[in-house]
Amino acid sequence: MLKKLTTIIILTSCVAISGTASVKSDKNRIKDREQKIEKQLSSMSLEQKIGQMVQLEVNMITQFDQRYTVTALQKLSVKELSDIISKFDLTNEYDATLMVVSNGKPKSSNDYQYQCLSQAINYKLGFKLDKTKLQNVFQTYRVGSILNMLGGTCASEVDVWNKATNTIQEAALKYSGIPMVYGLDQLHGTTYTAKGTLFPHQIGMVATFNPELAKRMGEISAYETRACGVRWLFSPSMDICRKPSWPRLYESMGEDPYAASVMGEAYLKGLQGDDPNNIDEYHVGTCLKHYFGYGVPDNGIDRTPANVNEQDLREKLFTPFLKAFQNGAIATMTNSSILNGMNGVANKKFLQQWLKDDLEWDGLIVTDWGDIENLYIRDHIAASQKDAIRMAINAGVDMMMVPSQLNYGETLKQLVEDGCVAQERIDDAVRRILRLKYRLNLFDNPYSNDNKYPLFG
């Protein structure tokens, strides 16, 4: 399988997805959905609500052979490690003598190699979910979303994906009563599934200046992703890049706001379809990233600060996002770096004021991988993890891509009980999360069937 935007963006224009002129929606269906959301919200405990705001990586519910964890492998001698590498036929990829020093202790510079080796071994052993971890995550913590590829560094087959996502969904419904939404990065095709269709990265897509091709790329990517049982993509990347040294330039829409807006709109429509309030079984929910100003770091290094004047922010960097919001994008991911002195996950001006208040946008805001931690570990804006969570949620973040800790929900609960985060803010976040799940028809049809997608690959 293979209107021209004005230069001055008027932020007071309403782009609530349910009321946007450029998308098709059934008003009665929307009214019925909102009533269901309010009824469900009123019946949920604080623990249930906060659990919906947590997103964990799939490794948190995966079964690993303890003999081949990173810690276990790092304790082995050269001979012992060499024997394991040979046992799993990985001698062409790994050399034990280069990974272990003479005294038997691993070189700290080779930690990444041990991580990759551990993942490669577990992939060969076969992907397995851990039933105990599944029960714990959904019954104790009421987690609302899972993300990331299966099996570490290797792409899994379609049937493996389907079995995994259905098993996870079954556990979510059994223990929490609310379907989970599975999120995945698919920026240029079905990148995390064996035999899936791959396309050029977004910079190559935009370089065609052909919206129809961009739309077809989105349609094919959506079709094959749904074949895997995944309904939510962290795509498209609407970043404008004006720093050639930025290492993620290839993921971006390039430097021109108009080209990015037109091509991004076409790609989004291909991924999500014509009605963002009723996404069918051949399309996926989108998540714009990285809102916004991520692609113009001052020094060109990824996840580093940028300083941009207000006019350029509105005319250039915000423009592609605005166009996508107007065309039904149901979610957005925060900027992972600092823009004009404030980290993207704590920027209340951009998250709450510009997006939720001024535009009356009713979609979901999710952080990028582990970015709340950066508020206190990297940027020293927050005094602690608890303080960082407070800042992010109060700024307008709805879902926390944690992704590898179980304590976030409990910490947020303490913040609410201490009066540091308002109950209304929690309700707003959970309302948006439930709305996304209704838009993806997860309540009516939570499971997937790969037999419906014979054109995969």
Region annotations inferred by a language model:
Residues M1-K27:
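Bacterial Sec-dependent N-terminal signal peptides
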Residues I17-G457:
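Glycoside hydrolase catalytic-domain context in secreted enzymes
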